[in-house]
Amino acid sequence: METLIASLDDAPIIDKDGYEYLVHPISNGVPMLDPALLREVVVELMQTAELDVDKIVTPEAMGIHLSTALSLQTDIPLVVIRKRAYGLDGEVSLHQQTGYSESEMYINDVEAGDRVLVVDDLLSTGGTLAAICASLSDIGAEIADVVVVLRKVGPSALDDTEFEVTSLLDITVEDGEVLVH
């Protein structure tokens, strides 16, 4: 995890209406994502996540690069929860709300009885992951594990749910600095 921790030291922090926003290659795609960082994160995901699953499920957009690399390494099929409806048979709509946005997302190719691993880049407010996990449960999928690379320590929409999230690193952003816990 040395590369990931070092990358946090170099990550810009920008002010968005009084909110200290971490800009990081894993969670934003900028600054440029170094292959060594992606490799380290995927190896750690492979060692941390429950991989006895039928599918890896990830939300668009910043979970895609992580989950694609994980899928390539494990041969587990990948399902991307999209921000656009395609109108395919069995498509399920979900409403997600975070601390800074609100939108619809769409799940395809997950069916009752599927055992799934949910992977995402960052858990901040928990709105996206809470909505995804609730929708997957409503479909009848078994959520074997939920793993994120970074978790911002603090209250989350997942706190009062049955869903537990494992993170590779827990962080806070204070006074323009990232602190690893």
Curated annotation (Swiss-Prot):
Gene3D superfamilies: 3.40.50.2020. Its EC number is 2.4.2.-. Keywords: Purine salvage, Transferase. The keyword Nucleotide-binding does not apply. Belongs to the purine/pyrimidine phosphoribosyltransferase family. Archaeal HPRT subfamily. May catalyze a purine salvage reaction, the substrate is unknown. This is HGPRTase-like protein 1. It comes from Halalkalicoccus jeotgali (strain DSM 18796 / CECT 7217 / JCM 14584 / KCTC 4019 / B3).
